[in-house]
Amino acid sequence: MCGRPRQMKATRHIGLLLSLAGILLGSTWADQEKKAESPKKEGAKTAEGQWISLFNGKDLEGWTPKFVGYKAGENYKNTFRVVDGLLTVSYDQWEQFNSVFGHLFYKTEFSHYRIRAVYRFIGDQVSGGPGWARRNNGLMLHGQTVESMTLKQDFPASIEVQLLGGFEQGRRTTANLCTPGTHVVFNDRVDKRHCLSSKSKTFRGDQWVTCEVEVRGSEGLRHFVNGELAMEYKLPQLDDGTLIEKGTISIQAESHPTQFKSIEVLEIKK
């Protein structure tokens, strides 16, 4: 997601107050960084608990699809499915995209946790997909519930960890930040730009990439790609300034086929 218009407009100016809060939070966040373990490319258990797989490798149990113009639970054109044990976003039954964006929501909300997803882009974008959506998916974190989505709503209010695949030439980072209906404090100020780029490498072709995100409630988030820190920010909030302490997890269907080998969560101490 990037290049599309914001869906919600800010209803209240945040300004100096949250910027100062971000500065005051800095020392706490720094202390947590020192205590946090480095992300593991492999592994199941840590001192804080056990990685839990959100995807069982067989079907969509625990997940609910929602497409623009369709009720929650309707898997439009069988877009989300399991293929050879991989959670797949497929467009082989589509002829034209027509802006029917979709999301697949996990059943449980989370607050303080790490999420680790192994993903890749495959095939070609479906006809009619927007240019910015080519080789584009996302982990929608701290999101609204699928039940609260309106029938024609494009995207859930959430913090999006934008997953991008590289093109033939040029740089195209992944694990970026996009903010549908939200803002964050970035570089000690409330940043209202819709998308912010990470400092990751570019990943071309159909190679598998591991994206891990450390989420600490309303305090802040950190993105890692293949174990390397890609970006960090604080105080995730709705457009009206309400801090987001917890929310749903969903993946996207934005017009390009995508596969997930695994999606795991490790809940961490507050």
Where are these regions (language model features)?
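Bacterial N-terminal signal peptides
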Residues: G15-G26
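Bacterial N-terminal signal peptides that target proteins for export
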Residues: C2-L16
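Carbohydrate-interacting regions of secretory-pathway proteins
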Residues: T28-K270
